[in-house]
Structure formats: structure tokens, C-alpha cells
Amino acid sequence: MLRREARLRREYLYRKAREEAQRSAQERKERLRRALEENRLIPTELRREALALQGSLEFDDAGGEGVTSHVDDEYRWAGVEDPKVMITTSRDPSSRLKMFAKELKLVFPGAQRMNRGRHEVGALVRACKANGVTDLLVVHEHRGTPVGLIVSHLPFGPTAYFTLCNVVMRHDIPDLGTMSEAKPHLITHGFSSRLGKRVSDILRYLFPVPKDDSHRVITFANQDDYISFRHHVYKKTDHRNVELTEVGPRFELKLYMIRLGTLEQEATADVEWRWHPYTNTARKRVFLSAE
């Protein structure tokens, strides 16, 4: 079983590397083609291979943009089968972190919550794979305040690491009543860059396909690379007006890393993207939107 998993993982990484190399070559050819069409200087980094790229441009035809490899897509079953989400915490959780994990379990339809106990990460991931879990969520805390969320897609990845801030739990608001567990409609806003679409896919594929008559709405709104999570239910007061009610919880997410592997491969998996906060331009740059 371990040999089979290692072989499948190697094949998956090889396909990902080939696809990334092909995408990079296609981007260089597109930059050269635009420079030739607009009669501009060829970019400095492309001048050595400009003749070879121009020769290969003759064999390119229109219509191949945006095509993805279904064999190499981690989310190829999204929309066909409902995701199976498992939620757990860091070791020795406080009572508030347990409450937050319970609220997250109600956010994702069909999710299950598991007490962490003394289980190691490797044992958790193996158990999730054996039971057909598609996504493992781990919540971290600092002195009772949730500060981190890890979303690991199984069986091969990716794994996204988020910082949590401005967390307001349902337990903090009196007389909220029960939460609807219907499959929600999703709103994603502000994810216009390539990395933004990647993060949007990681988040939205945690939810199953909703029914048309569902009155539950979950929003992921990106502004300046902070992703606001909001949870509402709506009801129609008449044929023109709709009344929105926030049911919580609410929090902000800040992405700081994406790894290509699963959670237990933290030491060996390649880093797909990492936030570098200590560079001179870190405060000015936004990564999840193309603005």
C-alpha cells in the first residue's frame, strides 16, 4: 500500500511538472507573439531563444487556451460527488477552539469533526484517505483565539495555509437560534488573478452543489488579499424584496502558503506559492486579484 501511494504520488508530481513546463513555454511564446504583432522590442530574457520560439509559433493554432488536463486536475470529481470534509484541531485544544471547530462543522454540509487526542498528522491523513475523505481541515489557536486554518486536499494535495483574524463565533452572540444545514449557494468575489482562481477553487470545492431552492448563502470576498467569510440566510418578504440575516460565524482569512503535497508531507512537498512579508514591496502588492 505504501509503495502504491509513493508511485501514484511520483506520477502525479511528474505530470504536474510537465504541465507547468508546458504552461511556462506557452507564456513565453505569447509574450514574443505580442511583441512582434505590436512592433515592440523583444523582452531581454527572451532574446536568446527568440528564433526557436518564433519557429514553434508557426505550428500553434487558436482554440487551445484555457484547456486543463482532467487527468492531472486535483478537483476533477468536483460537482460529481459531494466532498467529504473532516475537521480537527491542534493538540490539546482549549474550549473555545473546540467551539469554533463545532461551528465549522455546521458550515460545511456533511462534514465530520474528530477529536485530535494524541494522534499524529501522518496517522490522521492515512485514516482520512482510507475512509474516502476529500479534504482535511485543521484549526490552530493562540491562547484560546483561533489564529490558523489549514486546508489539505486528499489524496495528493494541494495544502493551503491561512491566518485567521477577526473571528466572531456564534457562541459569542446570544439568542441566535439554530443554523441551517442546507447546501449553500456560494459567492466568490475578487479572485481575478491566477493565484486567486487557485485559492477560489480550494475554498469553493469544500462545498457540494446546492439545490435551487436553498436559502443559505456563503460569501468569500477578497479585498487586499484578505478573504472575508460571511454566512447568511435570506427570505423573500415579497416578490421584489429579500431580507438577509447573518447567522455566523464570521472571520477573515489571509493566505500565506500553498504546498503541492498533503499535510504530512510538510518537509518534502514543493512549495507552490509563499507570501514574503519582509520584502520592500510587500505592503503594495496584491496577489489574489489582478488589479
From Swiss-Prot:
Task: Return one Gene Ontology term, BP aspect.
Answer: ribosomal small subunit biogenesis
What is the role of the protein in this entry? Component of the 60-80S U3 small nucleolar ribonucleoprotein (U3 snoRNP). Required for the early cleavages during pre-18S ribosomal RNA processing. Part of the small subunit (SSU) processome, first precursor of the small eukaryotic ribosomal subunit. During the assembly of the SSU processome in the nucleolus, many ribosome biogenesis factors, an RNA chaperone and ribosomal proteins associate with the nascent pre-rRNA and work in concert to generate RNA folding, modifications, rearrangements and cleavage as well as targeted degradation of pre-ribosomal RNA by the RNA exosome.
- Keywords assigned by UniProt, alphabetized: Nucleus, Ribonucleoprotein, Ribosome biogenesis, rRNA processing
Q: Which GO terms describe its molecular function?
A: rRNA primary transcript binding; snoRNA binding
Gene3D superfamilies cross-referenced by the UniProt entry: Probable brix-domain ribosomal biogenesis protein
* Name under which the protein is recorded: U3 small nucleolar ribonucleoprotein protein IMP4
Origin species? Pongo abelii (Sumatran orangutan)
Which segments constitute the Brix domain?
83-264
Q: What is the name of the gene encoding this protein?
A: IMP4
